[in-house]
Amino acid sequence: NRVSGLNSRQFTKYWKVESESPDYKVTFQGDTAEIVSPKGLTLWRKEKMSGKVTIEYDACVVVESDGDRLSDLNCFWMASDPQYPDNLWKREKWRSGIFLNCYSLQLYYLGYGGNHNSTTRFRRYDGDESGITNPKARPAILKEYTDAGHLLKPNHWYHIKITNENNRVSYYIDGERLVDFRDAEPLREGWFGFRTTLSRTRITNFSYE
């Protein structure tokens, strides 16, 4: 679907905000959405994706004033709730954008510039809810970068490309492949979510096929 839907006219048709704080804001300039997230927030694309998938979008973390924090240009993909595989929204109110509650989902997760822009990490979540309260049950880090070249630059527009093909999962940022993961039990369907926390971000040019 080449319709990005990141404008005021189409936004609610294609996207759904799941936010820990009721005080989040989404504003639009043309086909670019700006998200101010005081706490954890997932911007879910409403369509379920399946099979061979390529997702692309442009995004940046805005740092222009005192309250802006350079951190967390993250995303979920092939996300689903094992308890309700065909309905991601069934427990949306319970998840409520809270990061810990996302351990209840199966998904691939890339956190770019997480932990106050000190880490970039890739994980595969298996939907084990015990991870919500038990750190030892949380999914392993499958790939990690901590060097400055793989952390966020302020106000820089990144081009992100994600591919899922058979059992191979790849994540590219500005043309560099950060993740090349072969999954013994690949997640073949699910939803995409743009994820951030305590930040001001912009996203545009979203497409998938």
Model-assigned labels for residue ranges:
Residues 1-209:
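Extracellular glycan-recognition regions
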